[in-house]
Design a protein with these regions (language model features):
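Conserved structural core of kinase catalytic domains
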Residues: 1-18
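Short, flexible/disordered intra-domain loops and linkers
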Residues: 7-11, 94, 140-147
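Activation segment signature within eukaryotic-like protein kinase domains
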Residues: 23-24
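Protein kinase catalytic-loop region centered on the HRD/HxD motif
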Residues: 29-39
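Eukaryotic intrinsically disordered and solvent-exposed regulatory patches
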Residues: 35-36, 61-65, 126-127
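Hydrophobic HxD+1 residue recognition
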Residues: 44
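Activation segment/activation loop of eukaryotic-type protein kinase catalytic domains
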Residues: 47-108
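Helical subdomain adjoining the active site within ATP-dependent kinase catalytic cores
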Residues: 112-116, 123, 127, 133-170
Length: 170
């Protein structure tokens, strides 16, 4: 059975933090595997994530990252590879520029018309995590330090009872 990840979001809020961690962990593993194979999805967003919740005879209540105990039947499947890029077809130092009008869902490099590669997927992962936690799309604010270095931060505050160290580093 599959459903869109966005369908599990509550009204006005996200999902429980532990469920968000599970989905984000699964997505990180998928994206890491894709990147190791030289693939960029290019359009990671919550609408392109499907929940994988197949029935299993025995399913342990303790998560097993290796998929044992029925966990291989639970997780996330990515869809919509319309913007995918096979980096094996390009020189190792190849970078890209957006040839469309980038929107808020696109990475900062695209919006600022700067070269990008895997940043598109990392921004997408952060955006999905944000949507799972807060129940809405990510808005960022740009800060420029005295040296001209830009940093971007989400506009929402993390809840004090969340694993803030984990999410801040993410």
């Amino acid at each position: 059975a599959e459903a869109g990840v966005s369908s599990v979001l509550g009204q006005g809020g996200g999902v429980e933090e532990v469920l968000a961690m599970f989905f984000v962990n699964e997505l990180c593993r998928i994206v890491q595997g894709m990147h190791e194979a030289g693939l960029i999805h290019g359009d990671l967003k919550i609408d392109n994530c499907m929940i994988r919740a197949d029935d299993v005879d025995e399913w342990t209540s303790t998560y097993a990252a290796d998929g044992s105990g029925g966990w291989a039947a639970k997780g996330v499947t990515l869809i919509d590879f319309g913007r995918a890029i096979d980096m094996c077809c390009y020189p190792p130092d190849q970078r890209f520029l957006a040839d469309w009008q980038p929107g808020a869902q696109d990475c900062v490099e695209m919006r600022e018309m700067r070269p990008w590669t895997y940043q598109a997927d990392y921004y997408g992962l952060a955006s999905i995590a944000h949507c799972l936690l807060f129940g809405k799309y990510m808005d960022t604010t740009c800060y420029v330090n005295d040296d001209g270095l830009k940093t971007y931060k989400i506009q929402q505050s993390l809840r004090r009872y969340w694993q803030t160290d984990l999410w801040t580093r993410f």
